[in-house]
Structures are given as structure tokens and as C-alpha cells.
Amino acid sequence: MQISLEQLCAGKATKIKNKEYFTTKDYVMPFIDRMSKFTDKFEIQVKPADQISLNSDGEMNFEDIVYNRVWVEAQLPGEYAYEGHTQSVSLLYALDTRKPVYKIFQNAVRSACLNMCVFSPNMLQVRELESETAMDYSFVKQVMELTDNTRVMLEQMSNTFIKRETIFDNLGHWVDRCISSKFNSGFGTVKLAESTAIDAYKQLVVDTKSDYYTAEGDICMFDAYQAFTDIVTHDKGRDIVNKFEKTYLVAEVLGLPQVNNI
């Protein structure tokens, strides 16, 4: 669910399993203050607690609400962009996971479709969100200073093609890698569903209405990547916690080289 900054900052403090957690504002404003040096554009997604109160009009009461999952995305301005893509730095936290966690990460976003692009695990930091303890925001400065090699990967994919006669074999490899590939940051294992590979395959060679459909000839690796990341990015809010990890796994499933950011 997308909301405004004002609505976000109304999030109440909460107690989970006898542990006290701060208000939403206490967690997000130090991040927003740091990123406001670079941008004034923030996108916010949340998942409220399962039990919510309604006002007299039957609408969600934002004056009495707890957000269990929060994603604040700071969208960087033009000087950080490159053709067809922008960059963003995000703070994401979840209180209702097995261990409450928070993540700070940088990724690229394709302007035309808002698909995430992730090629380096070094752009992510994951920490346990301990009760009655402030977050450590130092990685914000670090990630802004890392060299972003996304442009190199995008150019490489644009010049790489999958031979059409091998697409059936590739589907088998993709499904196998979805089964075997995993991302573990120390707070649980993240995987791509096998159906992700099948759905991406359909977008590439079956669904004629798909933006990534290739009617004839070889298939551009860039389109294959976008078909996968479209599924991960636009999952109707089912999983906002692990989008970075799942998007990174797309590159692994497609057999793309890992990027090391310095």
C-alpha cells in the first residue's frame, strides 16, 4: 500500500512479543534527513498491522495505526541517472518477520516500467532491528560512495542474445537455477519461485501482448532480464521485504556475471 509521508509519520509505537518498538517516524526520519541532501522525492510502501481501526466513514484511521512493514525509497535526481534508468536508496524494515530486521540498499530503476535492477550484493546491508534501539544509518553514506556498475551490466545485456532455438533449453536451466539459487544475509533464505521462470518465458515467447515479447529471431538478454524483474517488482505488494534479494537472484538465474562494487 502506498501512502504519503504525513500518513507514514503517524505510525504508532508498538509491542511485539513483549518487546517495545519506536514510532514509525523515529525510524524513518533519520534516513529521510540524510537522503534529503540528495533528493526531495520519496516513494513509500507499507503493510499495516493485521488489525486496523476505521474512522466513522469506514476508511482506515491513520491517527491510530501501526505499520509492521515499511519501505521508504529515496529517488535520486538526474545527475545520478543514466539512459532509461534512475537510481534510488532505500530504507526497509519489518517488525513481523521471525526476527525484526531493517535493510538499507541501493538499486537502479528502469524509468519506463519501474522494474528494479540489482547486480551486486554489496549494495545491501541487513541488520536486526532490536527493541528500544535506534537503527544504524551509517551505510547510507557508504552506499552513496560505492561505484555503481549497473550501466556496464545493462550495456552488456543489451548486446547479448539468446538463440531462439535454445530458448526451450534455457527455460529448463532457469527453472533449475530457481530451485538451487538462494540468497542468505543471515536472517533467512530468499529464493525465487520456479513459476517466476515459467512466467518470464511466457512473457518472452508466448504472450503477444507482453512488453517483452519477441515474435521472431533471437531474444535480447536485456528483455529476458526485464521479464523476470517485472514479475518480482510488480507482485501486487505480496513481498516488499525481499525485493532486493529476489532481483539479485534474477541475474544469477540468467547466468549473468556478478558485479563487484568498490
Where are these regions (language model features)?
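Feature for intrinsically disordered/low-complexity regulatory segments and propeptides
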Residues: M1-D33, D40-E43, K47-D57, S195
